[in-house]
Amino acid sequence: MASAFRSSLKLRASARLPAVRTITTTPRLRAAEKPYFPNEPTAPKLATAIPGPKNKAASEQLNEVFDVRSLNMLADYTKSVGNYIADLDGNMLLDVYAQIASIPVGYNNPHLLKVAASPEMATSLINRPALGNFPSADWAHILKTGILKVAPKGLDQVFTAMAGSDANETAYKAAFMYYRQQQRGGPEKEFTEEEIQSSMLNQTPGSPQLSIMSFKAGFHGRLFGSLSTTRSKPIHKLDIPAFDWPQAPFPSLKYPLEEHAKENAEEEQRCLQEAERLIKEWHNPVAAIIVEPIQSEGGDNHASPAFFRGLREITKRNNVLFIVDEVQTGVGATGKFWAHDHWNLETPPDMVTFSKKAQTAGYYFGNPALRPNKPYRQFNTWMGDPSRALIFRGIIEEIERLFLVENTAATGDYLYSGLERLAKQYPEHLQNLRGKGQGTFIAWDTPKRDEFLVKGKGVGINIGGSGQNAVRLRPMLIFQKHHADILLESIEKIIKQL
């Protein structure tokens, strides 16, 4: 195992610099732009090869007790600040991956440090409650001033959870219970003795053969139910039993969009027709569909607002619940607080799941009938974590104080324009640019994607990929135009090295 690990380190060493030296890019702080973090570096700083000697030694040590084969880098979070992530060797990288889209307001955000040091936080941490049985007296206040303060339009209730997979899993349970409740004739109808007994044998009618429909290339998590709806990569699913649930096609759009409007509209219509056919004909009745506003792990695949409005109409027409997975797209990343706000739906989704940038998790809903008809049906010991809910409240306060959703929309437009220029200059390396008008939630395809990502560290950028060929940008909400200038300059440097 040790030799295999050393081999993987050698592969990652391709990010090394020609010599061990400090390198900085040219900072271009825009005159009218005040940085949110005055103490963050003005540009990336590279002090050693990547990985450096301290990082390699620490990785070897960690490998003795923890599987590090997915390791990207070991970070020093005591020195990371704002948009910059530090490693153990003194390197400071501009982070446009942000813990897989999970850090919203910067490393070591001063306001969040105050929240973390508050007596309220200390009480939540050392007296963690079983929320379903023993919530704190201020739990309603915490929810109303935090998670529910930013609830999607029309959804005024929440079930809190631990992670994105958990949020989706519990949303599926809510959909199934609602479906059967409607079949019985309402929440007041009692279970039959046959249902009770057969459920303990995992047989019908107590364990009904129902399904959740998801989309090709979608990602919804890695638990049993959520993994059955995940369709992005085989490595996530191999050897794991899965439910017999339908998969609908997701539109495969051609770019630039303005040059392929007719073809793309036809493609979206084809996918909508197939989705409705599957709902009507699948042998296990479909209780709900789940869809990402942008397929994030599956390759940053987009569809138009008209497509999603069409999906909503299909679900209403067929009495199927509509679940929107905002785990990666939510909390401001697309230039609106929730990505589905771009769609202008006539009626809201039935449930919206969230996590990542929220630093907590759960699903929003509005219909009281989505509460199970009896207690303990949607339940676990923790049912979320008050300490994480407090952090999300602090994040919301920062977003509102600094107008970070608006910043992300404006910075995204600026960044996209710069990428359009690079795409014209280097069309073989920057293909199918997408995400216009979607904040900083931008991606493109490149034939040498993996090499591109590795070389990113060599110019001081921590950047990620998705799908087979996509480079995805997931900067924080505090990412500004002067950061975009650094990123654009760095992307051009990488391209010239390919």
Curated annotation (Swiss-Prot):
Modified residues (N6-(pyridoxal phosphate)lysine): K356
GO cellular component, one term: mitochondrion
Record keywords, A-Z: Aminotransferase, Cytoplasm, Pyridoxal phosphate, Transferase
EC nos: 2.6.1.19
Binding site for pyridoxal 5'-phosphate: G164, S165, T381
GO molecular function ontology, one term from the record: pyridoxal phosphate binding
Reaction(s) this enzyme catalyzes, per UniProt: 4-aminobutanoate + 2-oxoglutarate = succinate semialdehyde + L-glutamate
Gene3D superfamilies in the record: Aspartate Aminotransferase, domain 1, Type I PLP-dependent aspartate aminotransferase-like (Major domain)
Uppermost EC category: transferase
Keyword Transferase recorded: yes
Alphabetized NCBIfam families for the sequence: GABAtrns_euk
Function of the protein: Deaminates gamma-aminobutyric acid (GABA) to succinate-semialdehyde, which in turn is converted to succinate by the succinate semialdehyde dehydrogenase. Required for the degradation of GABA, which is important for utilization of GABA as nitrogen source.
Subunit description: Homodimer.
Family as reported in the entry's similarity comment: Belongs to the class-III pyridoxal-phosphate-dependent aminotransferase family.
Cited PANTHER family: 4-AMINOBUTYRATE AMINOTRANSFERASE, MITOCHONDRIAL, AMINOTRANSFERASE
Full protein name: 4-aminobutyrate aminotransferase
Highest classification ranks of the organism: Eukaryota, Fungi, Dikarya, Ascomycota, Pezizomycotina
